């Protein structure tokens, strides 16, 4: 062996321990084929410990590594401007962490394999706040969403859509509690308004629709069919003073066949049009008189017969609730008059 060869061997042996020590703890820089640059500690030739990895597309990770893998606590800057700080596994956010998006929105909570998954809190750029369960970055499970305007939803979610059972509080103080389908009130639910109005019953596409009970602030209560928020179909109203109406409704008014019963003994059964007594019907007055015939604008109008408590009768023409025109009257003493009447 020549002196030159010997000197070369001694030099290599002297340098080898230094190289090994650098790879197993000292900070080093290394550039990879994809253009990425790593600066940090190594173990047995791979990233291990702490280090920073930068890619040409703007991605940057600083934090813990384990046997060549991003694993542990760290901070990642993504090309789109988002920044994630938290736990990593297999190079992806996993465990607990917080991401701040380029638009200022944030999410802090649980992650799985790079996806927002589990429990967390999201603050969106538009001011909306959501706290609850997530699946693949979408609201899923149970959660509470609040908007800056005062709207709040608390309940079930499916793939980012309100679905299931929930409670909605509106900015004006109204509260809905019940079924939600595809983000709208559908199914069975209760609405309570600030002025005291309440509704319990069926909903469809966000509106009162179906069978339900509607109680007005003044105490009037309606039980029956409703369509698009209005009384429509068959139902019963119990008024605050004890009067009742049972029968047909159309466009939120008494329309069709129905019976009105007053606490004073007044009873009408017959036809209604646009909320008024109109058409054929029969009324029993508080004094016991009974009229049967035609009506218009809530009054006897046209042809009809009235029988009084003393047995006297009138059968003939009426105008606006007054006997007027041709008719026949019978009196208790047996007198009969047939002819024309006025007032």
Predicted regions and their residues:
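Short N-terminal segments immediately surrounding and downstream of signal-peptide cleavage
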Residues: 23-39
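Conserved anchor residues at repeat-unit boundaries in beta-strand-based tandem repeats, strongest
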Residues: 37-48, 60-71, 83-93, 106-117, ...
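Bacterial N-terminal signal peptides that target proteins for export
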Residues: 1-9
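Sec/Tat signal peptide C-region and signal peptidase I cleavage site
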Residues: 18-22
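Bacterial N-terminal signal peptides
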Residues: 8-17
């Amino acid at each position: 062996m020549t002196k030159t060869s010997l000197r070369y061997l001694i030099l290599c042996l002297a340098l080898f321990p230094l190289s090994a020590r650098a790879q197993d703890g000292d900070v080093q820089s290394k550039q990879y084929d994809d253009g990425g640059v790593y600066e940090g500690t190594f173990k047995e030739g791979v990233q291990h410990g702490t280090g920073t990895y930068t890619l040409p597309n703007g991605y940057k990770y600083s934090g813990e590594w384990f046997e060549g893998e991003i694993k542990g606590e760290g901070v990642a800057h993504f090309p789109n401007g988002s920044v994630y700080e938290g736990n990593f596994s297999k190079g992806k956010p996993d465990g607990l962490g917080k991401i701040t998006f380029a638009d200022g929105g944030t999410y802090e909570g649980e992650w799985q394999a790079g996806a927002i998954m589990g429990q967390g809190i999201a603050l969106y750029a538009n001011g909306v706040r959501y706290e609850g369960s997530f699946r693949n970055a979408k609201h899923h499970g149970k959660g509470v969403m609040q908007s800056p305007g005062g709207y709040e939803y608390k309940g079930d979610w499916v793939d980012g859509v309100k679905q299931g059972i929930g409670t909605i509080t509106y900015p004006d103080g109204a509260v809905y509690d019940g079924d939600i389908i595809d983000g709208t009130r559908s199914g069975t639910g209760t609405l309570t308004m600030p002025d005291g109005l309440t509704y319990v019953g069926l909903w469809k596409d966000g509106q009162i629709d179906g069978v339900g009970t509607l109680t007005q602030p003044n105490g009037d209560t309606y039980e029956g069919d409703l369509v698009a928020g209005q009384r429509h179909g068959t139902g019963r109203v119990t008024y605050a003073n004890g009067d009742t109406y049972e029968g047909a409704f159309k466009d939120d008014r008494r329309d069709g066949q129905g019976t009105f019963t007053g606490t004073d003994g007044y009873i009408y059964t017959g036809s209604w049009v646009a909320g008024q007594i109109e058409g054929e019907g029969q009324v029993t007055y508080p004094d016991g008189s009974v009229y049967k015939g035609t009506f218009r604008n809530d009054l006897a109008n046209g042809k009809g017969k009235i029988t009084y408590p003393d047995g006297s009768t009138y059968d003939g023409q009426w105008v606006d609730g007054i006997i007027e025109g041709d008719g026949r009257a019978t009196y208790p003493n047996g007198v009969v008059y047939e002819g024309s009447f006025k007032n």
